[in-house]
């Protein structure tokens, strides 16, 4: 109840709501989701056959699930694929029947296309969540394999469990049959919702809270249902596409369907990442534009203090300690510090100093992080604490010599040039 009351109070706070709306819109634009969805749709089409091989190969390894292969295929194509594109199901079935005829080079190409698709998906989600560092390659492969195998087994087991439950005498009555029919109608949306929540939580190299993944998945499911309804309406009332494409009409329909599905999923992901990244900052707690170096120096001070105590800092802890940092700025700073090998990440996901700050000159930070040294004085958040005083003093030493140099007129630079034109 306290959490619910807290969310109600936040919604009543007009300034917070407007700030979040602007933040969300900027994230939508910055993520370039429509371009990312187009790229993923293209690679997904090429990964359909290898994905089917892996899925049905996993089911074939467990005789108990063999009888559910056809049922799982029919459930997917009947509920998630437009009717005009279901001829693809026959193509996939023929490909699986001819699996033994594939050469080694062909199998390598299929597996490579699947790995490329999965890698592209992970990169896209990492970009949406502003992840500073991707997973190691071995860890990435293990996650891919776990998602594919366990996801397939859970899907088949869920269908077997549902069939067993709906075969009970309770569901043979009129009321029970109505309830079973309602459950089967609701099942596709429930499957979509659960799968998208799991994708948001597992795929990005970022801790995604359930309270953020749920609204994002809900938005994605609503958009996918709207797309599904729109496809059904168009395909049921307009047959122009069949006259234009003829026997090939299934391919553009499938490609457009995959594209719009990815748009829905990525828009939901952008909402989830925005909810986790958004930090409402009162005016007094915002870093002035161009003063990112102040935040960087404070951040390094926090890591120096944590190192004394033998600790690391996770991203939530950093944002709690430094409320003037936005999630985007924090990720950018962490990425740059990792790139110059000043920070590293341990197996728990915490960030640690990788080098002694006593041997790191300020020039290295200035050159590599490419942050400006602001000349003007501006009110800085948390300037009176120990970290603020140290960072402000260093900043003052950096900009003091620049003030007199930059105060001279530009014309004075050319007073000693020869008078005759070249």
UniProtKB/Swiss-Prot annotation:
It comes from the Bacteria. Keywords: Cell inner membrane, Cell membrane, Membrane, Transmembrane, Transmembrane helix. InterPro entries: UPF0761_bac, Virul_fac_BrkB. It is a multi-pass membrane protein. The keyword Translocase does not apply. Its main location: membrane. It is found in: Cell inner membrane. The chain crosses the membrane at residues 45-65, 102-122, 151-171, 179-199, 213-233, 247-267. NCBIfam families: PRK04214.1, yihY_not_rbn. Belongs to the UPF0761 family. This is UPF0761 membrane protein XAC0937. It comes from Xanthomonas axonopodis pv. citri (strain 306). The lineage of its organism: Bacteria, Pseudomonadati, Pseudomonadota, Gammaproteobacteria, Lysobacterales.
């Amino acid at each position: 109840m306290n959490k619910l009351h807290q969310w109600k109070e936040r919604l009543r706070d007009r300034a917070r709501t407007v700030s979040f709306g602007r933040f969300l819109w900027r994230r939508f634009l910055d993520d370039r989701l429509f371009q990312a969805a187009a790229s993923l749709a293209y690679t997904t089409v090429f990964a359909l056959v290898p994905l089917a091989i892996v899925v049905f190969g996993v089911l074939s390894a467990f005789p108990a699930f063999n009888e559910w292969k056809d049922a799982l295929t029919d459930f997917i194509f009947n509920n998630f694929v437009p009717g005009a594109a279901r001829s693809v199901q026959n193509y996939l079935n023929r490909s699986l029947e001819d699996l033994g005829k594939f050469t080694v080079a062909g199998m390598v190409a299929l597996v490579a296309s699947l790995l490329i698709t999965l890698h592209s998906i992970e990169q896209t989600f990492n970009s949406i969540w502003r992840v500073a560092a991707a997973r190691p390659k071995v860890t990435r492969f293990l996650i891919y394999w776990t998602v594919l195998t366990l996801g397939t087994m859970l899907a088949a087991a869920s269908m077997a469990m549902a069939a067993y439950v709906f075969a009970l005498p309770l569901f043979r009555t009129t009321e029970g049959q109505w309830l079973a029919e309602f459950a089967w109608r609701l099942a596709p949306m429930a499957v979509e919702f659960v799968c998208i929540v799991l994708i948001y939580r597992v795929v990005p190299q970022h801790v995604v809270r359930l309270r953020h993944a749920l609204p994002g998945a809900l938005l994605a499911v609503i958009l996918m249902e709207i797309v599904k309804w729109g496809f059904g309406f168009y395909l049921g009332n307009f047959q122009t596409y069949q006259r234009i494409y003829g026997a090939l009409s299934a391919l553009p329909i499938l490609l457009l369907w995959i594209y719009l599905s990815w748009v829905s999923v990525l828009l939901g992901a952008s909402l989830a990442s925005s909810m986790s990244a958004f930090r409402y900052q009162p005016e007094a707690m915002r870093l002035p534009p161009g003063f990112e170096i102040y935040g960087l120096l404070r951040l390094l001070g926090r890591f120096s203090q944590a190192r004394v105590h033998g600790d690391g800092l996770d991203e939530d802890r950093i944002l709690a300690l430094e409320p003037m940092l936005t999630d985007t700025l924090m990720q950018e700073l962490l990425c740059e510090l990792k790139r110059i090998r000043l920070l590293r990440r341990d197996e728990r996901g915490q960030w640690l100093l990788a080098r002694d700050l006593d041997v790191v000159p300020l020039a290295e930070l200035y050159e590599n992080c490419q942050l400006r040294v602001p000349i003007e004085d501006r009110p800085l958040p948390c300037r009176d604490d120990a970290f603020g005083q140290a960072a402000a003093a260093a900043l003052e030493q950096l900009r003091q010599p620049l003030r007199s140099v930059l105060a001279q007129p530009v014309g004075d630079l050319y007073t000693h040039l020869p008078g005759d034109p070249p």
